[in-house]
């Protein structure tokens, strides 16, 4: 398997596409694992690109720094599950949810345009879990319920998606606390 693009190759690609592309989405894994991300984003911004960051919220201080430096135009943060099921859903037994909670609070303060999103898996998310997420992130922020899509990259073949009507029911549960809910991937 070939390694990913080197930073200089990525920047060369972006230089050639100025005026064609509007923005860059930095995704992962978890992009905030990389401590040198701000330098790369700064160069992207100098080229005139908008920058969106996809994150799981595990590194609130790094997120705050990037936002504070004006390097992010949009943040999409995954909410894996209700607080009580977060560790199991993330697949990390000793998962500490406090950093995620701090990132949620920071984004909800309105420091940068953002969305929350949850990829909904039948075996991991119940209606009660979805309701608890709604109580946690209650407000007018955009929240997307994304339908799970089985693939070769998902190690547990027993996982499955909810149907469209079921997803609509879950969205209705959320709308009491989070009116700006939309469905993706159906």
Question: Where are each of the predicted segments found?
Answer:
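Canonical Radical SAM [4Fe-4S] cluster-binding loop centered on the CxxxCxxC motif
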Residues: 1-9
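Conserved AdoMet/S-adenosylmethionine-binding subsite of the radical SAM
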Residues: 11-23, 32-165
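Short, charge-patterned binding micro-sites
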Residues: 29
């Amino acid at each position: 398997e070939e390694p990913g693009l080197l930073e200089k190759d990525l920047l060369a690609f972006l230089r050639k596409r100025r005026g064609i592309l509007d923005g860059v989405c930095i995704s992962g894994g978890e992009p905030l694992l990389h401590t040198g991300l701000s330098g790369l984003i700064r160069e992207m911004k100098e080229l005139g690109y908008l920058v969106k960051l996809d994150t799981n919220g595990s590194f609130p201080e790094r997120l705050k720094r990037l936002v504070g430096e004006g390097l992010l135009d949009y943040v999409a943060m995954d909410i894996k599950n209700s607080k009580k099921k977060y560790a199991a859903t993330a697949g990390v037994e000793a998962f500490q949810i406090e950093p995620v909670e701090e990132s949620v609070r920071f984004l909800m303060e309105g420091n940068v345009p953002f969305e929350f999103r949850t990829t909904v898996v039948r075996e991991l998310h119940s209606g009660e879990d979805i309701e608890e997420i709604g109580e946690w992130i209650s407000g007018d922020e955009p929240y997307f319920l994304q339908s799970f899509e089985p693939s070769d990259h998902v190690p547990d073949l027993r996982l499955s998606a909810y149907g469209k009507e079921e997803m609509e029911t879950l969205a209705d549960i959320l709308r009491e606390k989070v009116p700006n809910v939309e469905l993706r991937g159906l």
